[in-house]
């Protein structure tokens, strides 16, 4: 789904799917009052009648994509990599993950054409950061604005 779109260079397609108000699109469910992930894109028909499960994780990978794709948090076996994928259509995003090492925060915000990144790295951990423009660097523990 959305993660594959990012990894194959189609993050713009994943963002369109995220923000599209018609099915298939995540905002379709929200527009119909969803507070859970539905089994199908059109879990409620045009008359407001549910016809599939309205609490089903079949499309739940979107949550992982928001953390790992949009905000770029990847914490595995005590190592932290952050590679956010900002998109102007969303405007801003921020995610916090309570890892065994402590709270990890990654966020970004557009201001015109410029993107500002904010990261919070817990004590005793460093983060290898890769930005979309190709910059790569390591962050020490603490709060950082780039």
Predicted regions and their residues:
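Short, small-residue-biased leader/transition segments that mark boundaries at the very start
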Residues: 1-5
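Non-catalytic C-terminal accessory modules of carbohydrate-active enzymes
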Residues: 12-146
């Amino acid at each position: 789904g959305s993660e594959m779109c990012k990894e194959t260079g189609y993050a713009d397609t994943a963002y369109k799917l995220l923000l599209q108000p018609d099915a298939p699109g995540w905002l379709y469910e929200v527009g119909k009052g969803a507070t859970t992930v539905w089994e199908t894109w059109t879990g409620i028909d045009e008359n407001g009648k549910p016809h599939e499960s309205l609490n089903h994780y079949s499309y739940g990978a979107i949550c992982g994509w928001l953390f790992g794709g949009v905000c770029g948090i990847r914490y595995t076996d005590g190592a932290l990599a952050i590679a956010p994928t900002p998109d102007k259509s969303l405007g801003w995003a921020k995610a916090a993950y309570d890892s065994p090492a402590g709270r990890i925060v990654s966020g970004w915000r557009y201001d015109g054409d410029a993107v500002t990144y904010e990261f919070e790295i817990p004590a005793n951990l460093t983060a290898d950061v890769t930005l979309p423009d190709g910059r790569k660097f390591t962050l020490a523990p603490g709060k950082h604005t780039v």
